[in-house]
């Protein structure tokens, strides 16, 4: 894999993590009463759907965002560019790449594919530092 591809993959994952973190911060601005309002839920769903469509492959994600709304709280965001750092980028086969990140207690692996000359995140896996096996994680 050349340096340009590596840089593109790095920027894709970092930008995705950053935008998801901003979305999580936005969601935390609402109190419980506001979150129960249909218009608030619609706006939150619309925002995350826009991020997913910008950075991820177009596929149905029944158990993942934007269909299943969840987000981390301040101090324990699901996506935090200050805590999640890229440690490895590998090409698994033509047009498929693994971008591995690390936080304080786990590894995350973003599976990126190249489709129609565009790089998109297809899925994500998780592995705690003490584990040997990757498990499916939701975007």
Listing of model-derived features with the role each one plays in the protein:
Residues 46-105:
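Surface-exposed, charged secondary-structure patches
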Residues 1-65:
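Core segments of small alpha/beta cavity-forming domains
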Residues 107-138:
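Short beta-strand edge/turn micro-motifs at domain boundaries
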Residues 16, 86-89, 97-99, 110-112, ...:
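Hydrophobic beta-strand residues in large extracellular and virion-surface proteins
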């Amino acid at each position: 894999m050349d340096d340009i591809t590596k840089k593109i993959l790095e920027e894709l994952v970092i930008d995705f993590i950053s935008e998801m973190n901003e979305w999580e911060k936005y969601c935390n601005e609402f109190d419980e009463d506001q979150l129960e309002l249909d218009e608030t839920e619609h706006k939150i769903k619309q925002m995350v759907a826009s991020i997913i469509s910008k950075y991820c492959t177009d596929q149905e994600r029944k158990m993942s965002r934007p269909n299943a709304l969840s987000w981390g709280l301040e101090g324990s965001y699901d996506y935090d560019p200050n805590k999640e750092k890229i440690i490895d980028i590998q090409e698994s086969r033509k047009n498929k790449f693994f971008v591995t990140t690390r936080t304080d207690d786990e590894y995350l692996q973003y599976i990126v594919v190249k489709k129609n000359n565009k790089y998109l995140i297809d899925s994500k896996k998780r592995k705690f530092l003490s584990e040997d096996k990757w498990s499916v994680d939701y975007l």
